[in-house]
Amino acid sequence: MGVRASGTTCLPFIRILFLAVLIGAAPVAALAAPRAVATSTATAIASQAAGVASVPTEAVGRPSPTRISSGDTAWMLTSTALVLMMTIPGLALYYGGMVRKKNVLDTLAQSFIVTCLVTVLWYAIGYSLAFTHGNAFIGGFSRVLLHGMGKYTVTTLSGAVPESVYMTFQMTFAIITPALIAGSFAERMKFSALLWFMSLWLIFVYSPVAHWVWSTDGWLARLGALDFAGGTVVHLNAGVAGLVTALVLGKRRGYGRDAMPPHNLVLTVIGAALLWVGWFGFNAGSALSAGGRAGMAMVTTQVATSAAALAWMFVEWAARGKPSVLGMVSGAVAGLVAITPASGFVDPTGALLIGIAGGLVCFWTATYMKNFFGYDDSLDSFGVHAVGGGLGAILTGVFAVKAIGGTAGALEGNIGQIGKQLIDVGAVLVYDVVMTYGILKIIDAVIGLRVSEEEEVEGLDLSQHGEQVYE
């Protein structure tokens, strides 16, 4: 595996990426414009009595809502802020507390810079590839550089909120997904390689998968697979990519021999708490309206998270003699992950069972299975997110309630729904493995993925950033 000085690769990265996006995307948008859907952005007419604005319809091949709800829009703006908080500072602190003290700044920087990088890429091309009309596998170019998106533009996907709000809400999902991957390769990837990997992975993995599952054109959406808030699109996707990255990079120096305890569990607990609160925007916000379904998603999220934290705590207590704080917060995150695809489809009892299953299964995969196979999934991104997301997606097909989400699960006689969920999980897993591996090998051949042994021993805070938190 080639190792090169990471500092020499940042300038070419910036030149190539941003010149290509900001200069090259404009002609693409111009070429796509004749085929782009017509968009009207005329001024809204206020409806004072109902608090709703009447707006022109965006013609995207089928009728769109013609009214913007101020209440729904306010809820979606709030949810967007909550989900962004999940990454910065939530995930940054959660991961930052679990690494060794010589790598904490690099870990925090990963979440922070991924937020910045994905924001620009989502604006430039990612949103268009994920959520515009194209084919069953990928969207088109009609929203490159957000071309044609106006102040009052609405779409069939955005419902009764402006498309700009829907786009930004989806941006926060696109931000946290690659940020989650970093939990598997913490403490050993070059920062320059991280920038390249996150950029290519967003465009070639996340955007297509989001289109499959959440776009009205997507083949998994048309199949009838259920994923309310990202069990496969976000968590399975990120966790599988994390495992592939961990295997390609190899283990940390001294893994299995040297002690590598979390340097500050207080940061991790604070981060987990921020993730928990932000997850209400993640799940309940995915209803895209401030109504009964959002309320039920909030209830199921709270119940499943609490059940999973308790399940993890008790099984760890029985297995190891003491309940650890890290185990409690890991169980809570496992429950949040497991309920994500099901939160808008199941009732509280189904959520309780999904939470318990998520806590127990993720405890096993993050401890015994990882130790048995010997891979270095540093912060258990695979063990919690891939396993929890996949498990939750499958159990959605079991516990879905037609009166809540419009689709019955196996317990209501729709046994075939489990098959659709399995296809969803399998398709995302296979595509993710192949594409992630290819992206990593290309980057490794060009600039190298991993820091040198000396840099790893010194710590990534100093070797990659020239700074340190602790003297």
Residue ranges and their predicted role:
Residues 14-26:
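Bacterial N-terminal signal peptides
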